Regions:
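Nucleotide and nucleotide-moiety/phosphate-recognizing core
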Residues: 1-101, 111-124, 131-136, 151-158, ...
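Short glycine-enriched, charge-decorated loop/helix-capping segments at active-site entrances
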Residues: 97-103, 141-145
Length: 190
């Protein structure tokens, strides 16, 4: 899961990847601890009978690739077996999408991961919405979402966490069908 370390970043949109890991790990009796050789917090869980490793890089977002590469090298995990969970400006809050491969789409964390791993890894994209102007993106991702947007983001994460055992047991297609069939969430009337 991608995010920025430290309490000052914990509630920001850019930490949606960390939010996912923070929901997934305890649900499967897992916890993360600092692992200096991976430059992050890591832990092992068992999901659908498979042992999986979770990682939250403790470098800033745009330097996450080294942590993930170190982790994969040590565990001998090929890129195509890696899932990177990250915030996605191009999806509205309340939407999560799974895909394999592709470019960075302007996401600096993904750019760094791609520079260390190539493009073949899987991505779970958690929609955070777009501020409307490219000039506002940096401040937007580093701010806490509105209460409505946070609820929608967390609902998308909840659905992805609930469907994750299906990904492990049955493959990506079924999880993709469930996530991608969900219509965009509607904002509550103000």
């Amino acid at each position: 899961g991608l995010g920025n370390p430290g309490p000052e970043h914990a509630a920001t949109r850019h930490n949606a990847g960390f939010w996912f890991i923070d929901e997934l790990a305890p649900r499967h009796d897992g916890s993360l601890k600092p692992e200096h050789r991976y430059h992050g917090d890591a832990g092992r869980v068992t999901i659908a009978g498979a042992a999986l490793w979770l990682l939250k890089p403790m470098a800033y977002m745009n330097r996450s690739g080294l942590s993930i590469r170190s982790f994969c090298n040590y565990l001998q995990v090929p890129s195509e077996k890696v899932l990177v969970v990250h915030d996605e400006l191009d999806l509205p809050p309340g939407i999560a999408r799974l895909k394999q491969g592709g470019g960075a789409g302007g996401h600096n964390g993904l750019k760094d991961v791609i520079s260390h791993m190539g493009e073949d890894f899987w991505r779970l994209r958690i929609g955070i919405g777009h501020p409307g102007s490219r000039d506002d993106v940096i401040n937007y991702v580093l701010e806490r979402p509105s209460a409505v947007d946070e609820r929608l983001i967390r609902e998308a994460i909840e659905l992805a966490v609930a469907e994750f055992p299906r990904l492990v047991a049955e493959g990506a297609e079924l999880m993709m069908n469930r996530l991608h069939a969900r219509p965009p969430a509607q904002e509550a009337p103000g």
